[in-house]
């Protein structure tokens, strides 16, 4: 079973990602991870941290000479600002007198509405929001992206699967409603300042961000991930936790600030009649074909051979420059929420993180289905399965009967 976890704090020495269960033989380099982390820093409306934040990547284990070894893979992402935070975020005890002289160590007692501050302070018994926000910060997603890079490499090399994303809308911008992008479109999408797949949608998104900047506010939005090349049959209908859509939804909802997920046409499907809600099946020369993909590539919890489409709704960033009303947890008095350096909009980057979680879930499902200790073995199993599926396709079966 493919498993992953991360460790570390936003201003700590480093973040660490550990991925266990990956097969041996997958080509992977530090530059592969660096390229994905640079994509995570993309986007119009990002804060000052993105301008100087450099992800110092170190492969700690599980990879040798650019190839995975089959054991747990550990990846470290160093914090270039660590010297500024070394005392405040030290793991070992520090003299209170020394801490008292450091301004950035001042207790944060005014929780931000919409953030983990309030519930985290009460749940864990903290009198300072610092321990909460350090781990709850979206900076943690850098470690996930590192782990997801391994999953992406496996999916591409074992099955020929490609994962792309684009921004549908930001704030109240006019949503993109055209055809989904193809893998070849990813470079053009990343070249867009808001990772849009349409020039008109891009202009509308930028206008929204500019307005929010002027007003001292923040914005959320909607992103879509499209996955091509998936075979029929990943996931299962046999139980709820084996359904691929439940796994995808859980993984995407686990991303900071994500408040909603839909597969395919999702909530729009609920407003349609059944006669126009589903993807009708027709005979084709090499099996069945469909003229629509409203289901988004999943039926009954399983991939159906069409592109997978997953959308995620990101709420506006909770660190709002104009400061929201809150209560000081020490005094109980009315206050304004703490404000630290933050983005106006991080939706373009969220698309990359959603790609990551989708890739991890799909890699896990593929390894459950096809197994193997090495990439070569997994490929052999994939090819055998694809031949068996092709033989069961109506057109293929009919030809076999006719020739027999």
UniProtKB/Swiss-Prot annotation:
A GO cellular component annotation in the UniProt record: cytosol
Gene Ontology MF terms in the entry: chorismate synthase activity; FMN binding
Note describing how the cofactor binds: Reduced FMN (FMNH(2)).
Keyword 4Fe-4S listed: no
Catalytic function, reaction form: 5-O-(1-carboxyvinyl)-3-phosphoshikimate = chorismate + phosphate
Biological process according to GO: amino acid biosynthetic process; aromatic amino acid family biosynthetic process; chorismate biosynthetic process
PROSITE patterns, A to Z: CHORISMATE_SYNTHASE_1, CHORISMATE_SYNTHASE_2, CHORISMATE_SYNTHASE_3
Binding-site residues for NADP(+), renumbered to this chain: 40, 46
Pathway: Metabolic intermediate biosynthesis; chorismate biosynthesis; chorismate from D-erythrose 4-phosphate and phosphoenolpyruvate: step 7/7
Domain of life: Bacteria
Keywords, sorted A to Z: Amino-acid biosynthesis, Aromatic amino acid biosynthesis, FAD, Flavoprotein, FMN, Lyase, NADP
Biological role: This reaction introduces a second double bond into the aromatic ring system.
Quaternary structure annotation from Swiss-Prot or TrEMBL: Homotetramer.
Cited PANTHER family: CHORISMATE SYNTHASE
HAMAP family: Chorismate_synth
Family to which this protein belongs: Belongs to the chorismate synthase family.
Protein name: Chorismate synthase
Species assigned in the record: Mycobacterium sp. (strain KMS)
Originating gene: aroC
């Amino acid at each position: 079973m493919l498993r992953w976890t991360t460790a570390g704090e936003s201003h700590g020495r480093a973040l660490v990602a550990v991925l266990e269960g990956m097969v041996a033989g997958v080509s992977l380099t530090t530059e592969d991870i660096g390229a994905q982390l640079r994509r995570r820093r993309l986007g119009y409306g990002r804060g000052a941290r993105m301008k100087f934040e450099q992800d110092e990547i170190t492969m700690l284990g599980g990879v040798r000479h650019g190839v995975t070894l089959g054991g747990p893979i550990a990846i470290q992402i160093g914090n270039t600002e660590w010297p500024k935070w070394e005392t405040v975020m030290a793991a070992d005890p520090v003299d209170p007198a020394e801490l008292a002289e450091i301004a950035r160590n001042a207790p944060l007692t005014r929780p931000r509405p919409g953030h983990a501050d309030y519930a985290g302070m009460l749940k864990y018994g903290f009198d300072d929001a610092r321990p909460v926000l350090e781990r709850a910060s979206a900076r943690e997603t850098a470690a996930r992206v590192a782990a997801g890079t391994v999953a992406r490499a496996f999916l591409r090399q074992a099955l020929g699967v490609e994962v792309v994303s684009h921004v549908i809308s930001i704030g109240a911008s006019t949503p993109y409603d055209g055809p989904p992008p193809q893998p070849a479109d990813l470079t053009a999408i990343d070249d867009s300042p808001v990772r849009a797949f349409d020039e008109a949608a891009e202009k509308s998104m930028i206008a929204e961000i500019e307005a929010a900047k002027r007003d001292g506010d923040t914005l959320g939005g909607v992103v879509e991930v499209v996955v091509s090349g998936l075979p029929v049959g990943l996931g299962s209908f046999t139980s709820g936790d084996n359904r691929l859509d439940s796994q995808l939804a859980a993984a995407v909802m686990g991303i900071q600030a994500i408040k909603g997920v839909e597969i395919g046409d999702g909530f729009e499907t609920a407003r349609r009649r059944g006669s126009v809600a589903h993807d009708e099946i027709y005979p084709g020369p090499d099996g069945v074909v469909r003229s629509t993909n409203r289901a988004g590539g999943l039926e009954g919890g399983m991939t159906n051979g069409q592109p997978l489409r997953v959308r995620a709704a990101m709420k506006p960033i909770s660190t709002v420059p104009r400061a929201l009303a809150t209560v000081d947890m020490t005094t109980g008095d009315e206050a304004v929420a703490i404000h630290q350096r933050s983005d106006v909009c991080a939706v373009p980057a969220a698309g990359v993180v959603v790609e990551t979680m989708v890739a991890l879930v799909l890699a896990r499902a593929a390894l459950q289905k096809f197994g193997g200790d090495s990439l070569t073995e997994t490929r052999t199993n994939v090819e055998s399965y694809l031949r068996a599926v092709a033989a069961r396709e109506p057109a293929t079966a009919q030809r076999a009967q006719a020739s027999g």
